[in-house]
Amino acid sequence: MAQTFLKLDTGVTGTLPNANFSGGKIGQVVNKVDDTYQATSSNTFADTSLSQAFTPSATSSKVLIMCEHQCMKSSGNTGIALQLLRDSTNLGQFISIGGETEEGTRNDFGSACFFYLDSPNTTSAVTYKTQMKNYVNGTGGARVNGSGNDQSSMVLMEILA
């Protein structure tokens, strides 16, 4: 790709039309933070409270979704699985972690992070959300934001074409 340089003398005023610049620029950025405690022992995916509406500015835009959940288990041999959806479209299961409870009451899995580059192909509002389920048929349950200080987050970043 050829580089274009722009030399400006001091005191120049006006605007530069963005149509002259290449794609790949960052459009809007939306951040959602959630500290709602949720637990499940079900093997079926259910919505977490981490959900955010987003309206792309062009049908050619891509949306980079960056999610992070604080994951725990209540006890026993269990695990957690997380997946990402755009409205009702499943974008994929990204996290499956689990294991035995350590040191009696230690139940942390830690931070589960995942990234996804979506092409929603719309200028209408869409909603990105995560779902969770108990991953292992064990005796315990999976939790997000379980300690009272934990927070999960979702950052949505529009990449302009």
Regions from the language model: what does each represent?
Residues 50-52:
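Extended, low-complexity regulatory regions
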Residues 32, 38-39, 44, 56-125, ...:
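Terminal beta-strand-rich extracellular "head" domains
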Residues 1-37:
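Glycine-rich, low-complexity segments
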Residues 46-48:
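Short, solvent-exposed loop/turn segments enriched in Ser/Thr/Gly
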